[in-house]
Amino acid sequence: MLGVLRIQGALASAGQARLLSVRLLASKSTTDMTTNRGESTQSTSTEHFDIIIGGGGLVGTTLAAALAKNSTLADKKVLLLEGAPEFRGFNPTGPYQNRVSAINHNSIELFKSIDAWKHIESARYKPVKQMQVWESNTDALIQFQHDNFASDVACIIENDLILDAVYALAKESPNVEILNKARIQCVRLPRDSNSNHSELQLEDGRNFSCDLLIGADGANSVVRKEMNVDVFSLNYDRMGLVATLELGEDACDNSVAWQRFLPNGPVALLPLTDRLSSLVWSTTNEQAKMLQALPPTEFVDALNEAFCRQYPRVELADKAVQALNSLFGHNGSQHQVQYPPRVCGVLDKSRATFPLGFLHASSYVCNGAALVGDAAHRVHPLAGQGVNLGFSDVRYLVESLAAGAYAGFKLGDKQHLIKYERKCLAKNVPIMLGVHGLHTLYATQFSPVVLLRSLGLQLTQNLPPVKNLFMRGAMGQ
């Protein structure tokens, strides 16, 4: 959930943060690759491109569109390798989909710069005007109001609508070629800046070479493995459950994002329309499977209970929160939890689950290659930052490539690509550590930890300048 990521990241122990920072560089990830293209059943001829993007999806396709729209890079020949079949488009009058993203200000500005935002804006999206995050073991909460910022807290947009906008831009560009059902089998990268091009072979035997290979191929990136960079990853042993929900008649102005930290993980409700919301519920693997299998009426009852149920209280933490509010001269009514509109239904076949984890590559670049999106980093969805970090990668990489091309650098020159990496690491690592710290803080019911996180949340609520600072960071401003 936006806004929470930095609120308590500082509350995680300094020792843990230092340990994570070191371990980001600690776990070696290597792989043996077969580079003998003579074994292919297809022709061994090799087609050359200036840039090849290995992997499509939201980030890879947005990158292709951004490269095509950049005037300095407009003459570069780009190949987008998409593992999925050809995208069939998005129907703005069809049912709402369960895969949505909370898009922040910076990502929206990126879409505007490549002329994708007008396509999204003319279809459908929902601005988030307010947000509330609250505890289940105490009365600690934090609330954000749209009035405190120059722009909306976020915009909730279906993933396929974003893909529809950027895919159309990439497809209509004369210098971008899109190849569907294209999966990379093996990669060979240049050893140094004076070596030959990057080369790859697809599973169907086709061969390509390029000046710069960009890995946008997800958490199991083939490109990253061939780069032989250190990778730190964690399996949270948790699942995320998504669904599209119908709201009761009391949802007259559904523009608030809600998130409650439950004992097994956070549950979030994101507005889609006045009568529809999107669910992201992080919980144990067992509970996620159980929730997915429940009949619709029982699932709705379980969800409403999750938002309203009184969980066992931590008395010491509760008293500390009350004392903190009194110290700032606030009574209970001024900091009282508001509850989301009641859910009355779940759209058919909208429930789905996905595994949760953490991943970070120690380096995003090498000679002839660079990483973006989930190929470089993966975070818990509780802060809504995952895809926004990927879009930030796109912006930094295109800016760096354009500056390098203007200065006469080769596209795959690591000495210039390293500037992209430094910008990304400076932005991504603090956010990722903050998100991981939040996950760790809320994964335990140990009373001293509950006290610590509750005080941190309530202290931020009582200090508007600090609260606004955190929120602007989460919004990308």
Swiss-Prot record:
Pathway: Cofactor biosynthesis; ubiquinone biosynthesis. One of its GO terms (molecular function) is oxidoreductase activity, acting on paired donors, with incorporation or reduction of molecular oxygen, reduced flavin or flavoprotein as one donor, and incorporation of one atom of oxygen. Its cofactor is FAD. It is a peripheral membrane protein. Keywords: FAD, Flavoprotein, Membrane, Mitochondrion, Mitochondrion inner membrane, Monooxygenase, Oxidoreductase, Transit peptide, Ubiquinone biosynthesis. It catalyses: a 4-hydroxy-3-(all-trans-polyprenyl)benzoate + 2 reduced [2Fe-2S]-[ferredoxin] + O2 + 2 H(+) = a 3,4-dihydroxy-5-(all-trans-polyprenyl)benzoate + 2 oxidized [2Fe-2S]-[ferredoxin] + H2O; a 2-methoxy-6-(all-trans-polyprenyl)phenol + 2 reduced [2Fe-2S]-[ferredoxin] + O2 + 2 H(+) = a 2-methoxy-6-(all-trans-polyprenyl)benzene-1,4-diol + 2 oxidized [2Fe-2S]-[ferredoxin] + H2O. Its main location: mitochondrion. Disulfide bonds: none annotated. One of its GO terms (cellular component) is ubiquinone biosynthesis complex. The keyword NAD does not apply. It is found in: Mitochondrion inner membrane. Gene3D superfamilies: FAD/NAD(P)-binding domain. Its EC number is 1.14.15.45, 1.14.15.46. One of its GO terms (biological process) is ubiquinone biosynthetic process. Residues 1-25 form a transit peptide. InterPro entries: FAD-bd, FAD/NAD-bd_sf, Ubi_Hdrlase_CS, UbiH/COQ6, UbiH/COQ6_monooxygenase, UbQ_mOase_COQ6. NCBIfam families: COQ6, Ubi-OHases. Component of a multi-subunit COQ enzyme complex. FAD-dependent monooxygenase required for two non-consecutive steps during ubiquinone biosynthesis. Required for the C5-ring hydroxylation during ubiquinone biosynthesis by catalyzing the hydroxylation of 4-hydroxy-3-(all-trans-polyprenyl)benzoic acid to 3,4-dihydroxy-5-(all-trans-polyprenyl)benzoic acid. Also acts downstream of coq4, for the C1-hydroxylation during ubiquinone biosynthesis by catalyzing the hydroxylation of 2-methoxy-6-(all-trans-polyprenyl)phenol to 2-methoxy-6-(all-trans-polyprenyl)benzene-1,4-diol. Belongs to the UbiH/COQ6 family. This is Ubiquinone biosynthesis monooxygenase COQ6, mitochondrial. It comes from Drosophila melanogaster.
